[in-house]
């Protein structure tokens, strides 16, 4: 009888137990594909990013022209840059769908895996923000100025902290250099934290749409789910290539085609589309400190989900009232994203304030109350 090579070599044994012979519930749907898609996005970002870093210059006098040089003079530079910029959008689409699936199917019950996932979200958001500054266009410069200025709300340390982050009295060469360093370094940290995320996930075993224990009925990951993931990967890559080749600037901001000018403020400063919902929450509170607190809490509120879970059932599969609340939350986030891209004027201000209030109400009041009501109706 021959021994399988993958089960005798230490490194291959880890790969085998994580991606080949991993016991997986037989009934997980396509919503479980997004974890692997995020891994593909991360690897694609690292590879394209490395090639871009070979030609990019982190200096305010030549950063903008170095991006133009990548597009015009570097062989396939335009393609590498378009793939890098648009796979960031794909990354966030996948990450939001991944979180949405976790919220719907009660994946947050695995508190360690969920907490590390929230940390990963914060790291990815930080990396994307640093990357947005690097082309040194108008929106890059003013986005960096506005967002880093939010640190000044911290009591006592605020103003000093802002100058320390800037490396001077304004966003300048030192800021660009350190942001490039962080943008280069963070993806590798994300890669390491993702490994820990997987480690904790495989410790408990994957959740499934029923929310019930599936230890008695599992199948190996390969070939069943590896081929299923491959289909998802091909669909995502097709969409990414469509964006990169046909409309690479659709998700970007036209202001970034103008080199950074500290003397001219753009009419409407806004971040990338995937941050618009948090930006709308930030803007909806007139007080600066209150806005920053709301911005932070809009992400950190995800850490409270294991504590606010009141239902006797894990998933929302058999809870129609909770499903209605969930889809209302999704619509609310879409409204916030839309409002974040609009100028600060009536009626967008009041819509943003109402949508922001609703966002926190869903997490803190509606979801727990509806879960308790369902328990009552089911006489549990």
Curated annotation (Swiss-Prot):
The keyword Transmembrane applies. It is a multi-pass membrane protein. The cytochrome bc1 complex contains 3 respiratory subunits (MT-CYB, CYC1 and UQCRFS1), 2 core proteins (UQCRC1 and UQCRC2) and probably 6 low-molecular weight proteins. Binds 2 heme b groups non-covalently. This is Cytochrome b. Heme 1 (or BL or b562) is low-potential and absorbs at about 562 nm, and heme 2 (or BH or b566) is high-potential and absorbs at about 566 nm. GO terms for molecular function: metal ion binding; ubiquinol-cytochrome-c reductase activity. Signal peptide: none annotated. Its cofactor is heme b. CDD domains: cytochrome_b_C (cd00290), Cytochrome_b_N (cd00284). Keywords: Electron transport, Heme, Iron, Membrane, Metal-binding, Mitochondrion, Mitochondrion inner membrane, Respiratory chain, Transmembrane, Transmembrane helix, Transport, Ubiquinone. The keyword Secreted does not apply.
């Amino acid at each position: 009888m021959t021994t399988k090579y993958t089960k005798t070599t230490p490194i291959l044994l880890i790969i085998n137990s994580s991606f080949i012979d991993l016991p997986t519930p037989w009934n997980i749907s396509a919503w479980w594909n997004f974890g692997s898609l995020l891994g593909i996005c991360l690897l694609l970002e690292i590879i394209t990013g490395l090639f871009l870093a070979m030609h990019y210059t982190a200096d305010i006098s030549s950063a903008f022209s170095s991006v133009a040089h990548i597009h015009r003079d570097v062989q396939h530079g335009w393609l590498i840059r378009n793939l890098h910029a648009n796979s960031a959008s794909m990354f966030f689409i996948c990450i939001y769908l991944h979180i949405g699936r976790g919220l719907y199917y009660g994946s947050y019950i695995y508190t360690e895996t969920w907490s590390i996932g929230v940390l990963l979200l914060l790291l990815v958001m930080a990396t994307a923000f640093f990357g947005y500054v690097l082309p040194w266009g108008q929106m890059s410069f003013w986005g960096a100025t506005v967002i880093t200025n939010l640190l000044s709300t911290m009591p006592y340390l605020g103003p000093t902290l802002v100058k320390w982050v800037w490396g001077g009295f304004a966003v300048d060469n030192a800021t660009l250099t350190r942001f490039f360093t962080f943008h280069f370094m963070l993806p590798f940290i994300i890669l390491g934290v993702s490994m820990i995320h997987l480690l904790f996930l495989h410790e408990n075993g994957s959740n499934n749409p029923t929310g019930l224990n599936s230890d008695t009925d599992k199948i190996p990951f390969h070939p069943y789910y590896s081929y299923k993931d491959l289909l998802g990967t091909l669909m995502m890559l097709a969409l990414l290539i469509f964006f990169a080749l046909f409309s690479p600037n659709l998700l970007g901001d036209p202001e970034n085609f103008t080199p950074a000018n500290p003397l001219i403020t753009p009419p409407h400063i806004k971040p990338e589309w995937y941050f618009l919902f948090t930006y709308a929450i930030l803007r909806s509170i007139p007080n600066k400190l209150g806005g920053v607190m709301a911005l932070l809490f809009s992400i950190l509120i995800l850490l409270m989900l294991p504590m606010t879970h009141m239902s006797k059932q894990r998933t929302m599969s058999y809870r129609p009232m909770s499903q209605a609340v969930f889809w209302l939350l999704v619509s609310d986030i879409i409204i916030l994203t839309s409002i974040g891209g609009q100028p600060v004027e009536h009626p967008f201000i009041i819509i943003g304030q109402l949508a922001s209030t609703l966002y926190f109400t869903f997490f803190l009041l509606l979801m727990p109350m509806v879960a308790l009501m369902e328990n009552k109706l089911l006489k549990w």
